[in-house]
Amino acid sequence: MTVLLDTNVLVALLVADHVHHEAAETWFAHIDRRFATCPITEGGLVRILIRQGQPAESVSSVMSAVSSHPGHEFWPDDLPYRVIPMTGVIGHRQVTDAYLAQLARTRGGRLATFDQGLAKLHDDVADLVPTKG
């Protein structure tokens, strides 16, 4: 089974000074499955890296490294929003969460997140990545 990394987990894995970097690395080292990214999560990573001041060329290298990892799968964002269950969505920030959860369901995978609310709302498909503290 493949696990889709939400943007925060993806960023935490790749940004050494992220508050959850160590927790993400520990979790990732112990999962025994492939991992996936999609345009939404990759776009989030690109935005954050550029906002932190990384040059676009450097960001492109990071994205190439992620996609060339032997355990990586790329999942296209190919679901129309009309098929996304909106049960429990009460705010605009939960729309992307609902999309990622449905993408994982559709692909027969899981969704890894640090977001307790997302994990609770989509407990059928979301795994809460443990943090220290």
Where are these regions (language model features)?
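Conserved beta-strand segments of alpha/beta enzyme cores
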Residues: 34, 71-73, 125-127
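Active-site neighborhoods of divalent-metal-dependent phosphate/nucleic-acid chemistry enzymes
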Residues: 69-116
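Short, well-structured N-terminal submotif of metal-dependent ribonuclease cores
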Residues: 1-37, 49-61, 132-133
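Short glycine-/acidic-enriched loop or helix-start segments at secondary-structure transitions
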Residues: 15, 84-86, 121-124
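Charged phosphate-binding loop/patch that engages nucleotide di/tri-phosphates or the phosphate backbone
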Residues: 106, 110-133
